[in-house]
Amino acid sequence: GHTAVPSMSLVPGGDATLLFTNSGMVQFKDVFVGTDTRPYTRAVDSQKCMRVAGKHNDLEDVGRDDTHHTFFEMLGNWSFGDYYKKDAIAWSWQLLTEVWGLPKDKLYATCFRDDKGNVPQDDEAANIWKEQPGFDPEHVLFFGRKENFWQMAEFGPCGPCSEIHIDLGEERDNLRGRDHVCGVNGECTRFLELWNNVFIQYNLFDDGRLEPLPSKHVDTGMGFERIVSVLQGVDSNYKTDLFKGVLDVLASLTGVSREEMYKDFTPYRVIADHVRSAAFLIGDGVVPGNAGRNYVARMIIRRAARFGTKIGLHEPFLAKVAEPVIEEYGSFYPELVKSRGAILDNLTREEIRFARTIESGTAQLQNLLDRLRDTKTSALDGVDNMGVLDGHRAFDLYATYGLPFEIARDIAREQNLDVDEAGFRAAMDEHRLASGGGKAMGKLGGEDAEFFAGILKDLQKKKKLGEHGVEYDPYTSPRVEGEVLALVMNGQSVQSASFGDQVEVILPKTGFYIESGGQVDDTGYIRALTPFPSPSLGRGGRGQGVEGEGGS
């Protein structure tokens, strides 16, 4: 028998190499590398996984197809120096065909053949497959390292793997009639990977040597959502009962029937996936924020909210969509029930925050995209001649309006344009360094940015500021004059301030370097040229009374 092991958190404790738990093997990694042992040699689990960053990032595919998710459950069985290929393959076949009743003639198995010629072909696994009752020997297919060789890292434990695929029928060929590869590991959706059996038998050294491990292990992984779609006979993971409750809520909110929903399914898939992901993230303590895991939580919530506007949902709705997620998964994952209040509250608050700035942020983005499309020239700042928006400009939109890169990219791609991701990440890293090692995107990130964006929008409506906001020129003149347009104290807009108050001021123009810009000795002063009843100063310089010092 196997020991049932609970899922670990989406936050992988003790593993600084991972942002999120992205596979079932993460909690057993120390066993494979030999730094830990377990009181069992056989295990089975259903692991919560997130794939939204790094090598394993499915975000771009979510919504565009029926099989990818940011959050999913990975089913797996494990052998730590116990059974090996013969039992693992036989039990896989038995479960799929005898227990679940999948048609034997529709199943294929892939095995490893080294395209580099350095590792022996896995004839052992191939021959075991051919011995399974009712298995078609012609359905054993060989592939190279990309498809059928697994490595935990650049060096260390590794080995061949054997994937099980199912032929869903000619009608599932989503590229039917076009010139494409229709087959296992091909380009269409007719053939679906169900299960992967990884056989960890080698240790890879930095000089390229492969040596047999003293103990051989088995690591299997099967996407829960995929196998449910096959067993329920539907053509989309999102049409299984796993998402029924969520889609029922969306249908009620929009007044759209299932048939109408399926005609333009992308927004519904994105919302269903992202709300489920956000609920599980918050349940594991990852709340919306500006850096790392918290940025991911914020991004997927805002992306879901933005897709909500595409189907007519302009008031906060995500908490309502999350209710069935908590209800349906809560019995197996009690952390969802325990964190119910936090989940619903964070979803609603994040939606409200984003609603304050999305209009301004998307308007500024659209202005840049219009220029990009109309000119396709590098003569304009922030655009190039390849239809790609400069990543630093995209970062400015996030820093000012809280518009995540992923949403900017969505909007650009809807117009056959794109955004430079490398440039965005570089700008983000530069800003983190400038603001002292990544302090939540600096003073002008996140909620602070959104608050000031709201003031900016109001001043623009009143014609007190132009389209581009505060005029910024720290180079031309050491002296800049302007009237006080707005005052901020303790994070609130105020009409007046008294002597001794620490306040911030919004000016029509400034000669100060932006926060975290310039050098240590780049300082200056704000002075009142004439007496006025409520002296204050602020953004660009914080201080007390009528005179204060501003710095970079």
Model regions and ranges:
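A glycine- and charged-residue-rich anion-binding loop/surface
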Residues: 1-531, 550-552
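Short, low-complexity intrinsically disordered segments enriched in A/P/G/S/L with frequent Arg
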Residues: 532-538
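Glycine-biased, low-complexity coil/linker segments
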Residues: 538-545, 549
